[in-house]
Amino acid sequence: MTKPIFKSKTKPLGWSKISSKEVINEDEEEEEGGEEGGEEEEIDNNKNSNNSSSNSNNNNNDNNNNNGEERKVEKEEEKEEINHYRNQFEKDLLDMELKALNRETIDNILSGLNSYEIFKEVNFDFEKLYSIIISEPPPLFDTFFDSVSSFEIFFTDCLILLCSNFPDGIDTSITRPNFNDFYNHFKDRGVINKYISRENIHKALNDKLMTDYFNSGIYLGLLDTLDIAAIRFITIFGKFLSYEVVETISNSLFRYRTDKIEFLSDIIRELLLCNEKYRTLSKSYDLVQKRLQKEEFTFIKVFEDDDPKLFSALYQPPDIIKLITEPEKDSGFWCMIGIFKSKRILDYLIRTEPSKSWFKGKESDYFFSIAEMGGKYFNWTLLEPKLIKKEVNQKSLKGVIPPRELNSQQRNTQFFRVFNGVTGFNDIRFVYANPSLAQHAIKFIQKVTECGLFLNTDVRNVRDSIPNSNSFLFRKFLEVNFFYRYEKDNEVYQHQPTEENSLLYSTSIISRIVEMEVTDLLSVVLKNLTQQGCSLAREAVDERSLLSTIHSDKYYNSSIVVLHNYWPIPPKFCDCSTSFISMANGKLPRTYSGSDGVIPYIFFARNHLTLGFLLSIHNNITDTIDINHWISVAISGGLYYDKEEIFRKYPLLQKESTLQKYPRPVNILEFQTLLENNECIEYIARTFIKEIPPHEVPTVKHSDLLILFEISVMKKRSIRSKESLQAELDLIEEEKREKKKQKDKKKNKSNQNQKNNNNQNNQSNNNKINSPSSNKLTQNVTPPSSPVNIITSSSTTSSSTSSTTSSTTSSTIEPKPPTQTLPIKTSSPTKPESQKPSTPDPLIPKSSKSTTKNNNNNNNNNNNNNNNNNNNNNNNNNKENREMALEVINEMEKIEIEESLLSTSSLVQPQQQSQQSQQQQEQQQQQQQQQQQQQQQQQQQQQQQQQQQQQQEKQQEQQEQQESIQLNQTLTPIIPDFQIGKFKFSRDENNIIGRGSNGTLVFRGIWNDRIPVAVKQMQKAFNPHISKEIEVLIRLTSNNCSNMIRYIDQEEDQLFVYLGLTLCEESLQDLMESKRYKEFIEKTTTTNITTTFNNNIIDENLYEQRILSLFKDVINGINFLHCQDIVHNDLNPRNILVHKGNFVISDLGLSKMQVETSYSFTNNAPTGQEGYHPIEVLQEKRKTKSVDIFSLGCILFYLLTNGQHPFGNNKLLRVANIVYDKPDLEPLKFNAPALDLVRLMISQDEKKRPTIDTILNHPLFWSTNEKIKFYESSLNLLKDPNNSQSKHSKLLNYYQNDNSGGVLFLSKPWNQIIDPFLIDHVENNNNNNNNNNNNKQNSKKLAIVAYQYDQVRDLVRCIRNSLVHHKDILRSITQQQNLPPSSKEFANDCLKSQESVLLYFECKFPDLLFHLYQQFKKSDFNSKDYLNIKF
């Protein structure tokens, strides 16, 4: 009989955990006890044998003693062997060597427990059953249990076996029983109740040994035979298992899974449902790669098996709703469905209850999302017919031409059935040169074509995704496991497959596939777009993409050939950018300018096969280009970043482009030579140069090939050798030297002629001024009886090209007979300048002669200096000087002839001639003086203008320096560590003064080394046309608009654009948040009013007026934008900055600008989360100028209420209040004009919102003069007989139209509100004025109309009279002797000006003016005839 292992001396097992050491010690004690018992039995047997056999001898006793010693030795050896096995098993367990476990040992355990009857026999006492089993272990079995087993492990085995019998006797409808069901089922059976409590089970299942046990036991021992038991065990007790245990079970199943285990997905499903941490980590994108490497379970297994059960366990209803409502936020999920074609999971999504509840009224959105995801990953199984119908739109296609048989009217109205869901070409990471996905795309597009649908030719640009833990790591995982990276060899940065480049170079679907170079895919796309007889237009393909493909050094013949079959490739590339055209027109010859600003594609081919194909379709081998033209087009076309990059790659091209003084045409062979492209050079030579055998082409020099190419291909007439070319160069140099010599000679001759002309002019002028008329002619005096010979010689100097001649005319005049002309004598050639003309000395005074010489010498010196200074002038100046010299000479000849005639008459009438000559001299002197005065005046004016300009420039510089000094004093000093162009700034974190969307940063910096600016750094990738838009903003803000932030300058590099803005102190939001807004208003408020009445009210009035003046700054800025047809679209306190005590508008990034490149400055639209956008913006409707009016209304409320918002201060509720039109204007209830204007400006109906002009005409913004005019016009309006009726007069006394049920405007008679002494003098002055007027008109005293103190009309009359006659009233008060000095001083403050009078009545009746304004708006008054107000 087997002894129970637990004796009374041992402590009961209970629920205390039995460690392996305790079990080992108890086993050793039992072994020792067994040995002692065996020895006692042997002794008793010996005694009996001795008694029975009396003839026994002593030898037997000796043998027995020897046998006992041998047995002791054997037992010691067995103990050592047992200890050896025990140590070995413990080592295996510590090293996690699960293969060392004996499968048969565990089978023996299970064979003893497999029967449910054994639990009944022991009355479900687990301790008793545990004692029985371990009391008689098989060989070595005790060592296994001693080192490994514990009561918890045994207890776990029992729970698993009990789960196999759990369905007996309970409701079979329970598919997923829980712990309560298990407990209720077994709680009344034996003593099991004390073992299956929650605490005991939790303690057992979280034991450290459970990990090793489940790693081996579940798979090796249980699952092959007890599949239902294992599933039920996890279902019932899964929530008690720790994450480590659950992960161990999952890894064992996932690592050693076989096809025999059909219930594997059921076990994984139960594990997912029972442990939240395990479920979260299994669907994590961050850990997917790591878990796959460790052969652990991930969500990819779900999509790979297309198992809806596992999917329902992995994704709970909240997850499903999120996937349906926001599919783009979890693109990895839809990517897995698309890659593995998980149609059953998709069907489950459609049929699931959360989806059905969400579908109400939103089926189209869901179907659109599914269709878009299906198109993104080219999965046709995701697109059922009903989903495709939701994606089909009737619209026109860019670049697709309808069949030609249609007439023009039908062709214009032709629409296509377009499928918009193919967005897979947007994501270059998944598609770019990926053969597996390309094959899916081919089949997908073929299905679309079979349905008669057209693909949308427009490809949307993908956005730069900011790397985060989810999307970035998951994309990397997809690249590693499902796609391979593709990078072009020897490609520049612009054409690497990056998302930034897809943003910069937007293209069509055909161009995108041409870049991908997948021929089969391109073929099916072209077939789709040309189905039903359609053809492709020129704009269907982006020529920049085609240019980049042709420029690749690899050859993709099939793609280009396929494209050419459907879309003929043009012979030349044309860049339509304005900068390129302007550059071409300015630098290129006629053959390259204007509309011919194109370059043949053959000059961009770097592969000889590509070049051959292009030459085969267009035989343009004789075309030529200009190198600088090619460089500019290559840069504008996106092939290279700048010239430096081109020159680094092609040094010969740099040398040729820099040496060219004038554009020179270059043929294709010479261009390929400059590129050092040997393959293309050999191809051109073998194909087109027939004089050289093809096999000898590689041996011929490139220079010889160029000569032969010019002769045979370019059709040059003569062969030029090196010697002839050198001789031609020598001749050209000699010709240049000769031309230079001739130019120098001409300059010298012209200078000499100019000197001679100047000398003669000076001499003649001096003779005219200093000598009498007789000295102007050379006379030979003879006696009266003899004739008098008068010889006049005049020398003329010809030009530098003609010879110099002089003619002398001599005339003989007799006194009595008539005058006789002597024969003309031809003089010899002109003498040199050193020789003087032969004139008698006595006829010329010495003084005049000396002065003439001095003047001539001075003039010569001055002329020499002038000539030396003018030697560097152009030939045009010399021509002008020559022409002027000839005119002077002609005039001098005419003067001399006239003087000769005058001299003859002077002999007859000397006195008259002398008088006339004196008059002429005086006149000439006066004219010269006048000319000199005019010249001096002009010089003075020019100097004054220059001085004024210099002063203005100095003033501007001083202002800029003062501004910079002020800003530098208020701001911390800038230590620049980065410079771009004229900008210098520091990229330190402390130097950042603003942040924006898409990585935009604003730094404090310096422009032009002295002016502080704000430098805004923006990424080019988000807006490739940002430079042009900044140019528009710079021109826009330079139009003297002081209420807009100034856009000063821009610079750019490879990644960013840097914009210089006016550096402002802070924003309006900063003022409010720092609680310095009131202090700012008070500091910037200036007033000249000093009063002694109601200073608090005056302070409040001035405070409000300052706020309104600041608000006018914002209105003027918006008015400036609206005049330019620009809507700001993002007005809020953060975009209103403080600059020099005024407000300026900033951040035109969301303005709707009429720019050729784009209509928005950034790609981000306003979200409206801050509550400054109207409902039409929130609903994404058409935006008009009224959007800014709504924002202005919110800002006006914000300013007047110290930072409050008209739709609530809670940002989360503002949007809802705007949508439901629930403003809260309670803070403005005591400011009626502001309340009225704000209510109109924030009206939900955009048509009811006022314009900018209407806002500025509102009474809230009236000046003092406008208010005075309004009172005067109001009185005239009330005097109108049509308005003076009792009905109209009484209407002013009430707030409402109904005078019976309305509220009185005056709470008491208005004479009780005004000071008594003032009303008395106002009445007296009114009576006096009426008497005076009546006496003047009728000379009779008429009845005086007295004031009625309960009528608003009379109050208006009183105010008007006080404004007009305030001086008379003040004089009468000061002359009154009974009044105390304080009253007189008070009256002086109130009546010293119209402004003080108006301020006094506004303090007494603050709502009167606006009350009149509202009443006059009504149709009962004919206010338009009197008031010039736009209501």
Swiss-Prot record:
EC numbers for this chain: 2.7.11.1
Domain of life: Eukaryota
GO BP, sorted A to Z: IRE1-mediated unfolded protein response; mRNA processing
InterPro entries in the cross-refs: IRE1/2-like, KEN_dom, KEN_sf, Kinase-like_dom_sf, Prot_kinase_dom
List of residues binding ATP: I993, G994, R995, G996, S997, N998, G999, T1000, L1001, K1016
Catalysed transformations (reactions): L-seryl-[protein] + ATP = O-phospho-L-seryl-[protein] + ADP + H(+); L-threonyl-[protein] + ATP = O-phospho-L-threonyl-[protein] + ADP + H(+)
One GO MF term attached to the UniProt entry: protein serine/threonine kinase activity
Coiled coil: 57-97, 715-759, 860-971
UniProt keyword terms in alphabetical order: ATP-binding, Coiled coil, Kinase, Nucleotide-binding, Serine/threonine-protein kinase, Transferase
Family designation: Belongs to the protein kinase superfamily. Ser/Thr protein kinase family.
Protein's name according to its UniProt entry: Probable serine/threonine-protein kinase irlA
